[in-house]
Amino acid sequence: MTDVRKVAWEDVRLEELNPLISRRLIYSEAQMLAHVVLKKGAIVPAHDHVNEQFTYILSGALRFWIGEHADAPGDTYTDVHAGEVLVLPSMVRHRAEALEDTLDMDIFNPPRQDWLDGTDSYLRASK
């Protein structure tokens, strides 16, 4: 039988990745839910992963560069604002910048192993 859990976000440890980005994680065997707090100007460097990702903006706004534009950010981007969701399939390269102080909810399937074991150095070294 599966373990059922009820979790309050305020009871989940806030992990500071760098001065501009922090997060809280709740996960199970098959999926991961993350509250990600980004201060204005925070950069999530270009990366990809096997995990499918939904990014739901709860407050603020993120600018995403997708695919070939992730490595050479320019005028081709997608802005995602509060109340909007960006759906990223597996292995789609992407980069993001916080246009303002932002709280987003990321959903991953399967869970991000690099986030669980702390090997997400691309994110920890960003500004």
Predicted regions mapped to residue ranges:
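Histidine-centered metal-chelating micro-motifs
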Residues: 43-45, 63, 85-95
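Short, conserved beta-strand element in jelly-roll/cupin
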Residues: 37-39, 49-64, 68
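Ligand-binding loop in jelly-roll beta-barrel domains
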Residues: 90-114
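Conserved hydrophobic/aromatic beta-strand scaffold that supports enzyme active sites
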Residues: 6, 25, 35-37, 54, ...
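A cytosolic small-molecule/anion-sensing beta-strand core signal
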Residues: 58-59, 81, 100
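Short acidic-glycine-tyrosine-enriched beta hairpin
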Residues: 69-90
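Short histidine-centered beta-strand/loop micro-motifs
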Residues: 17, 24-25, 36-37, 44-49, ...
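A short, N-terminal "cap"/entry segment at the start of jelly-roll beta-barrel domains
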Residues: 1-34, 121-127
